[in-house]
Amino acid sequence: MRRFLALLLVLTLWLGFTPLASADVAGLVPCKDSPAFQKRAAAAVNTTADPASGQKRFERYSQALCGEDGLPHLVVDGRLSRAGDFLIPSVLFLYIAGWIGWVGRAYLIAVRNSGEANEKEIIIDVPLAIKCMLTGFAWPLAALKELASGELTAKDNEITVSPR
């Protein structure tokens, strides 16, 4: 029985492990080497008043990776060699979205303490909003400071619990 279980274990491990598969970039090739892309580039249409705008656009796309159809694809697997394609714009988007949210939160906290909070939520106090907006660029540091001090989160006794 021990030999049978040992043989079963060896077979399970041997058949269970698969060789490492490398998809690299899923069959994508540099656009400058793709015949379908070259065909599309030859028929480039100008999109602006610049007579060479179509050609310039395809020169920029030639640095990307193309599929069989000759269209550029985004590689979003975290490789730093392709950081300009997705990583940098996505981090910039998150920073700007956080800035907008932080400034909105700061504005609501500032008007909450005034006597006419409901009115200032509808009719925006522009000087106060600009003041909040100019301090919003450092929102990640301010958020960490408030998180460390406990000001960012609500205390347990301030959270209502459903009677269910």
Swiss-Prot record:
Residues 1-23 form the signal peptide. It comes from the Bacteria. The keyword Signal applies. Gene3D superfamilies: Photosystem I PsaF, reaction centre subunit III. Keywords: Photosynthesis, Photosystem I, Signal. Disulfide bonds: none annotated. GO terms for biological process: photosynthesis. The keyword Cell inner membrane does not apply. GO terms for cellular component: photosystem I reaction center. Belongs to the PsaF family. Probably participates in efficiency of electron transfer from plastocyanin to P700 (or cytochrome c553 in algae and cyanobacteria). This plastocyanin-docking protein contributes to the specific association of plastocyanin to PSI. PANTHER family: PHOTOSYSTEM I REACTION CENTER SUBUNIT III, CHLOROPLASTIC (PTHR34939:SF1). This is Photosystem I reaction center subunit III. It comes from Thermosynechococcus vestitus (strain NIES-2133 / IAM M-273 / BP-1).
